[in-house]
Every structure is written in structure tokens, then in C-alpha cells.
Amino acid sequence: AGSYLLEELFEGHLEKECWEEICVYEEAREVFEDDETTDEFWRTYMGGSPCASQPCLNNGSCQDSIRGYACTCAPGYEGPNCAFAESECHPLRLDGCQHFCYPGPESYTCSCARGHKLGQDRRSCLPHDRCACGTLGPECCQRPQGSQQNLLPFPWQVKLTNSEGKDFCGGVLIQDNFVLTTATCSLLYANISVKTRSHFRLHVRGVHVHTRFEADTGHNDVALLDLARPVRCPDAGRPVCTADADFADSVLLPQPGVLGGWTLRGREMVPLRLRVTHVEPAECGRALNATVTTRTSCERGAAAGAARWVAGGAVVREHRGAWFLTGLLGAAPPEGPGPLLLIKVPRYALWLRQVTQQPSRASPRGDRGQGRDGEPVPGDRGGRWAPTALPPGPLV
């Protein structure tokens, strides 16, 4: 057949139709008057034999077709090129779990972030309540058209306010009744309220400071604020999604992120957003001359050091329609073009679950508290405050 095709190429009609000009399949069919011979010519004419490169992996078989190929996968494998084991999770596959994936003996299973439920295909995730995490309303997050007002914050961004009404730190709404912030911020004042983007103020009835927080070193500088009543979704705000470390490392961190936080403009805290990309620990450590631990992460963004950031800002990443929290800004970054060092929130996923799922045992907030090193907080009056110990169990 090969020699026959070669001879035909130099016959006037086929040479004119298919080599001097681009021909269509029907024109070649008129020359050969035979489907099998036409198909063999057409595969060569349209790019040769794709199966020659052995694109089907894991012992899959390949069948050439016009302008392409088709793989038949061996048992236990699937995907266009048979690259995916049916029992394993593969972050790069487009037809896999929309949110979280768990490998199994025969097949993987999917689950969804808070407020989402599995679709009929058992892979997609659909918001099913008003407080579904990581969703953005139509009002988010640009300036009102024709207005010079401040940029609207993400719906999970909140401010921390003291008893005198002064905003002093930022925080992140991770559930309708829990705000994540730094332990340092949570210890600054005894009386704390949370102010949402709609200027609703919610009293903090208790605080959970990580039991391994070290004020001197800044290790484990995280705290959860337990709100006296939940945020009214979606008007007052929406929580961001949280993720485990494996999902964050393999799926989220390779993607670009957004640092959404608060910066100082005079005495006012105004929202600011900055596109960031993940920086590998070794590179970040060299740039900052610091040790990057498993509980910290680095991000790089243009002119990040030019703004006066307030602690409690958050790095979020969008994945298939939902926004996930990957980093918490613990302190103002140094001036200059260097990367930002943040608290790696997914490393605290177990601690977050322990706190949010237990009965409320947080420290009550009086009008007078204990500052760091046990000194009274100036300007506040009333009761006493101390960090809450978590129930026995593993800590991350």
C-alpha cells in the first residue's frame, strides 16, 4: 500500500488537489475510490501516525485515527493517555475531584469544602447554603462604578476593633462564627470586636490561642476568635475555604494567589489586594536570610514592601470556582522587593478542626485582660483572660 500511495502522489489529479493545494477528504476519496486506501493515505497526509510515539501509557493500546489517536487503557488505568491509576488522586486531571480527593483500594473518592455538596457525578462540588465557603457575590470586589471609594475587601476580610472603637488588626472569616487572626493580635486588647466589610460589629466571646505559641520567636502565631453570634451570610460576609496541607501543596500553591489585607493610610485601615506567587523555601530563606519552616511559606508580589500592611491579611487562591486560604500575614513585611514570609495556614488544619468542632471552651473576654508577659492591658477594665488549653490529642 505504501508504494501504491507514493506512486499516486505523482499522478496529476492527486498532486494538484492535495500537494499544490490543501485538499479535503472527499477529494482524496474520489481519487482512490476505496475507503480503506483513502483512510490510510489520509492518516499520513494529515500528520503521519501519532501512535508511533507510543502516547498510551501503562500498557495501553493505541489506535490511529484521522488527525489523532485513541487509547484503550489496561485495567486499573484511565485518562486520554492512560496516565491515571483509577485508585489514585491526580491534581492535574481535569475530570477529577473539584475539591478534595482521597485515594482508595479500587477508586478514589471526592469530598467538598464547607457549605458545598457533591454533584450527581460524585466529583463536582455545588454550593448548597448561604455561607458556602470561598464564594464571591456579584458585589465583590471592585470599587463602585464611577466612585472614588476604597476598594471593597474580600467577603471574608474583617477588622479587629478594641473597646475604644479603634481598628488595630485584620482577620479572616473561616466559618460564620470563627475568625482566624494572629495570636499576637488577639492578645493586644481584652475587649475585641470584629467588624465585617458591611460595618457590622460582632462581639468576640472567647479566644483560642495556639497552645504552642511563642511570643519571643513568633512560632505558631495563630488564634481563633469565637464570635458571640454568627455573621449573617451573605450580606455581612462569607467565609473562605480552608484546606489540608497535602491539598495545598499539590494543588493550590503552584497557582498564583492574591494577598488580600489591610494597609494603613494615615490612621485608617483600608483594603488592598496584591497578586502573589509562591516562592520555594530555599530561595526564600536565602533572600530573607531566615529559616523557612514547614509552618511558614513565602510569596512574592510586586511592591509588596511599599505598603504599610497590618497583621492579619490573608493569601487566598482560587481553585475551580472556590477560594482557599493558604497564608496569614503575621507581621508587616520589610520594605523592598523581597518575598513575604507568612504563616502557612494549611499546616494548622487539624488544630482548626479541633477548635471549631469542640464545645465552646474559649477564654471569656472581660473588660480587662492580660497582655503578653502577664501585664494588664492599658485602657481596659474588668475581668481576667488566659489562653485556652486544647483537649488531649495531636497538635499540628
Curated annotation (Swiss-Prot):
Q: What is its main location?
A: secreted
InterPro entries reported for this sequence: Coagulation_fac-like_Gla_dom (IPR017857), EGF-like_Ca-bd_dom (IPR001881), EGF-like_dom (IPR000742), EGF-type_Asp/Asn_hydroxyl_site (IPR000152), GLA-like_dom_SF (IPR035972), GLA_domain (IPR000294), Pept_S1A_FX (IPR012224), Peptidase_S1_coag_factors (IPR050442)
Write out the PTM section of this UniProt entry: The iron and 2-oxoglutarate dependent 3-hydroxylation of aspartate and asparagine is (R) stereospecific within EGF domains.
Domain EGF-like: from-to ranges: 47-83, 85-126
Q: Which cellular compartments is it found in?
A: Secreted
Expression across tissues: Plasma.
Where in the chain are disulfide-linked cysteines found? 18-23, 51-62, 56-71, 73-82, 89-101, 97-110, 112-125, 169-185, 284-298
Gene3D superfamilies, per this entry?
Coagulation Factor IX, Laminin, Trypsin-like serine proteases
The Peptidase S1 domain extends over 135-357
- Return the SUPFAM superfamilies for the record: EGF/Laminin, GLA-domain, Trypsin-like serine proteases
Q: Which molecular-function annotation in GO is an example for this chain?
A: calcium ion binding
**What is the protein name given in its UniProt record?**
Vitamin K-dependent protein Z
Gene (name only): PROZ
